[in-house]
Amino acid sequence: MGEFINVLVSKGKSNLIPEKDNLYGQFVGEWDFEWVDNQGTTGERHVQGEWIFAWVLEGTAIQDVFICPSRKARIKDYQPDAAYATAVRMYNPNTEAWDILYTELGGATQLEGKREGNRIVQTEINEKNIQWVLSLI
């Protein structure tokens, strides 16, 4: 398994990614977050999670592991819709955007990530054009 990790994980960003398009490099590392579901309703819930990001594939992509509830919280706070998921974001020099594949048990989603002002907007590639917006960064 050690060789797999050695060829997957990279020390940093590839020079093939222009700095202006380095949208996700700021997230490399380990993060704790609070997931708020059904905000403002009687069903509102708050769940602690983890999000871990690393450069991969010679620094041309960023992969993350999304864990919600967090590994620690999963033991005492079972959630029936818990996620232990991963996403790979690979820079596409032809579109100057990021091709993204998010997958978890039971499904996968393809998105395209671009900067819009001071936000990162990830548009789902399907007939619905759903957007996942990363803001307040």
Indicate residue ranges for each PLM-predicted region.
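Hydrophobic small-molecule pocket/channel-lining residues, especially in calycin-type beta-barrels
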Residues: M1-I137
